[in-house]
């Protein structure tokens, strides 16, 4: 018979934001301190993830923070013509401030403020929860540019993102600004059903994991947002139950899954072996488990 509307409505509600806002403010102040080694350089600090996109649920506590240095940038030149690539190479000036040094300086800034609560993870610098302060994952990043045209510094076109390096030294580029902006536009175009439906899927995922029906880590929130981002606007509306059924039917019977995109519209949503796309098998495992739970409720 499906999951009752009352349950879906409960799942659709946004979690508390007061503690996360306070945590973000504390982390941001530490990163923007005048005592940091990167003070005076051009950088920005912003929220990403569930709190940044208003898709957080009650069970969530981690706050995702990005510090991005704009004085140095990495580039993707694969879309440039040979002539434009030559022009880029002639204009390029190597940076003297390395990513490794910047991340170390960010680590020092956080350690200066939070002491032993700070640890380096594979991708993020983790600031442990303490008292009313929530756990924060801080990504130290540099500007990233995917170039489409380069005739000179004042005659170029590129999509701007961020990039960072994981523990294995692999460069990971992403586009949080585009993700957030596109998600908000889609939310408005869907008559404001999108973000509550993301929260429904996230709570459903939590229940699947708690019930032993889905392995933890297979369905990150970022990809659930991406999945619903692809669903046509007319599939949203009337009730959460209708939204769920219409979305799942569209994904399973109408969508060309190879053409689904991430909400940033820079990467395909389903792709094998990358840090920026959802493994197809993981996506199928979540979708199948979600439909099964719906049918057996």
Curated annotation (Swiss-Prot):
InterPro entries the UniProt entry points to: NT_2-5OAS_ClassI-CCAase (IPR006116), NT_sf (IPR043519)
Disulfide bonds, paired cysteine numbers: none
GO BP annotation list: defense response to virus; nucleotide metabolic process
Binding site for UTP: 48, 64, 174
Statement: the UniProt record of this protein carries the keyword Ribonucleoprotein: no
Positions bound to Mg(2+): 62, 64, 137
Record's cofactor remark: Binds 1 Mg(2+) ion per subunit.
Domain of life according to the entry: Bacteria
Cofactor: Mg(2+)
Positions with a binding annotation for ATP: 48-50, 202, 221
EC number: 2.7.7.-
Catalyzed chemical reaction(s): UTP + ATP = 3',3'-cUAMP + 2 diphosphate
Family as reported in the entry's similarity comment: Belongs to the CD-NTase family. E01 subfamily.
Purpose of the protein: Cyclic nucleotide synthase (second messenger synthase) of a CBASS antivirus system. CBASS (cyclic oligonucleotide-based antiphage signaling system) provides immunity against bacteriophage. The CD-NTase protein synthesizes cyclic nucleotides in response to infection; these serve as specific second messenger signals. The signals activate a diverse range of effectors, leading to bacterial cell death and thus abortive phage infection. A type II-A(UA) CBASS system.
Something else known: This is a complex CBASS locus with the loci capE-cdnE-probable diadenylate cyclase-capV-dcnV1-cap2-cap3.
Name of the protein this chain belongs to: Cyclic UMP-AMP synthase
Source species: Escherichia coli
């Amino acid at each position: 018979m499906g999951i009752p509307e009352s349950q879906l409505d409960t799942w659709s509600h946004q979690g508390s934001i007061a503690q996360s806002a306070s945590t973000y403010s504390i982390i941001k102040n530490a990163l923007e301190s005048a005592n940091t080694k990167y003070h005076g350089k051009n950088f920005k600090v912003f929220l990403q993830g569930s709190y940044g996109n208003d898709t957080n649920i009650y069970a969530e506590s981690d706050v995702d923070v990005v510090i991005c240095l704009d004085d140095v940038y990495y580039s993707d030149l694969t879309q440039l013509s040979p002539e434009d690539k030559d022009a880029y190479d002639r204009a390029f000036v190597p940076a003297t401030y390395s990513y490794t040094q910047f991340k170390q300086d960010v680590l020092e800034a956080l350690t200066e403020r939070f002491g032993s609560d700070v640890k380096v993870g594979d991708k993020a610098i983790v600031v442990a929860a303490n008292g009313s302060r929530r756990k924060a994952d801080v990504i130290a990043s540099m500007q990233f540019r995917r170039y489409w045209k380069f005739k000179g510094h004042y005659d170029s076109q590129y999509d701007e993102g961020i990039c960072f390096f994981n523990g294995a030294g692999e460069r990971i580029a992403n586009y949080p600004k585009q993700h957030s902006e596109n998600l908000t536009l889609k939310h408005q175009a869907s008559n404001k059903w999108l973000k509550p439906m993301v929260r429904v899927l996230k709570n459903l995922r939590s229940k699947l994991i708690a019930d032993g029906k889905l392995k933890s880590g297979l369905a990150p929130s970022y990809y659930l947002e991406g999945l619903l981002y692809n669903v046509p606007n007319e599939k949203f509306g009337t009730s959460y139950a209708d939204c769920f059924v219409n979305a799942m039917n569209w994904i399973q019977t109408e969508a060309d899954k190879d053409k689904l995109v991430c909400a940033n519209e820079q990467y395909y949503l389903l792709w094998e072996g990358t840090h920026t796309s959802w493994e197809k098998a993981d996506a199928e495992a979540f979708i199948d488990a979600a439909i099964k739970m719906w049918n057996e409720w």
